From Swiss-Prot:
This is Mitogen-activated protein kinase 4. The modification Phosphothreonine is found at residue 191. Dually phosphorylated on Thr-191 and Tyr-193, which activates the enzyme. Activated by threonine and tyrosine phosphorylation. The modification Phosphotyrosine is found at residue 193. Induction: By stresses, hormones, heavy metals, phosphatase inhibitors and infection with rice blast fungus (M.grisea). Down-regulated by drought, high/low temperature and UV-C. One of its GO terms (cellular component) is nucleus. One of its GO terms (molecular function) is protein serine kinase activity. The TXY motif contains the threonine and tyrosine residues whose phosphorylation activates the MAP kinases. One of its GO terms (biological process) is intracellular signal transduction. Keywords: ATP-binding, Kinase, Nucleotide-binding, Phosphoprotein, Serine/threonine-protein kinase, Stress response, Transferase. It holds the Pfam family Pkinase. A motif (TXY) lies at residues 191-193.
């Protein structure tokens, strides 16, 4: 549980109070009352909390020493810029970013999100039965949120069960946008720093420079397969093993299937893999609805140009009980996420401060400069 403590050195900052959770100090705005820690990751700790002003339950994520690693600081900045613009019921809402006391020297960032109960990874590994209706509804919401992102020109690039938050009503929301990019920035980023390996599309594993929205569709296919089978479909141990597992299931690729590979070494590697007829998805998921298998087959296609799009997936017969085209408006404007990858820490800190101001119009310039 959260325990209230005295401020460090007995010197508290106005408008803040202090709690410890899991040996971590939280310095948070007095309107938030923490309840208990609910998650821990490489970034820091998440706790549930109540906003006293609105009586709403929220999740507070503390990112410790955010500027110690410049790449991680850029990820955080990118997520803040993106979430300020996104408004969709299947995308997590960022409700607040707490203003630090010192503009030029703050080290930690506190993000306030809507509170969800669990994530899809926890549900999949639990003993809770998942019916066809559950799988269908989770997939529908994931596709719906993704269609909104793609309509804004955003690739998520890190979809996996742990980044899909779920509540007790089975509502699903996509989170963790630190690796998201706009669709018009081709070949500019390290491919290796994209998508957890098990959910990574073949074109990323093969180091192809030109990738697009279809990388997210592949990840959705892997997540859907995991929902159906309660275990990862391609749990590769490293990059080449990952490709091998994919080919083992999909079967040996024809010349036409590998035409898109612009890396000669990668193309050669695929050709050296021993012949395999593949494994029918119907035998891997014998309990699955036939239409679910049909849609899964269309998502897990090796050649990205032949892979189903998000809109086509929503229009697939498996989704027809849930999909209403008129209820899926696109994002209002494409979002510009262009951030100079070479920014220094001081500039990243200043840009984060500017993002925070959007949530705090009451903060007057000139205070705590």
């Amino acid at each position: 549980m959260a325990m209230m403590v005295d401020p460090p050195n007995g010197m508290g900052n106005q408008g803040k109070h202090y709690y410890t959770m899991w040996q971590t100090l939280f310095e948070i705005d007095t309107k938030y009352v923490p309840i208990k820690p609910i998650g821990r990751g490489a970034y820091g700790i998440v706790c549930s909390s109540i906003n006293r002003a609105t009586n709403e339950k929220v999740a507070i994520k503390k990112i410790n020493n955010v500027f110690d690693n410049r790449v991680d600081a850029l990820r955080t900045l990118r997520e803040l810029k993106l979430l300020r613009h996104l408004r969709h019921e299947n995308v997590i809402a960022l409700k607040d970013i707490m203003m630090p006391v010192h503009r030029r020297s703050f080290k930690d960032v506190y993000l306030v999100y809507e509170l969800m109960d669990t994530d899809l990874h926890q549900i999949i590994k639990s003993s809770q039965p998942l019916s066809n209706d559950h799988c269908q509804y989770f997939l529908f919401q994931l596709l719906r949120g993704l269609k909104y992102l793609h309509s804004a020109g955003i690739l998520h690039r890190d979809l996996k069960p742990g980044n899909l938050l779920v509540n007790a009503n089975c509502d699903l929301k996509i989170c963790d946008f630190g690796l998201a990019r706009t669709n018009n920035t081709k070949g500019q980023f390290m491919t290796e720093y994209v998508v957890t390996r098990w959910y990574r599309a073949p074109e990323l594993l093969l180091c192809c420079d030109n990738y697009g929205t279809s990388i997210d569709v592949w990840s959705v296919g892997c997540i859907f397969a995991e929902l159906l089978g309660r275990k990862p479909i391609f749990p590769g141990t490293e990059c080449l093993n990952q490709l091998k597992l994919i080919v083992n299931v999909l079967g040996t690729m024809s010349e036409a299937d590998i035409e898109f590979i612009d890396n000669p070494k990668a193309r050669k590697y695929i050709k050296t893999l021993p012949y395999t007829p593949g494994i029918p998805l119907t035998s891997m998921y014998p309990q699955a609805h036939p239409l679910a298998i049909d849609l899964l087959q269309k998502m897990l296609v090796f050649d990205p140009s032949k892979r189903i799009s998000v809109t086509e997936a929503l229009e697939h017969p498996y989704m027809s009980p849930l999909y209403d085209p008129s209820a899926n408006p696109p994002a209002q404007v494409p979002i510009d996420l262009d951030i100079d990858e070479n920014l220094g820490v001081d500039m990243i800190r200043e840009m984060m401060w500017q993002e925070m101001l959007h949530y705090h119009p009451e903060v007057v310039a000139g205070v705590n400069m």
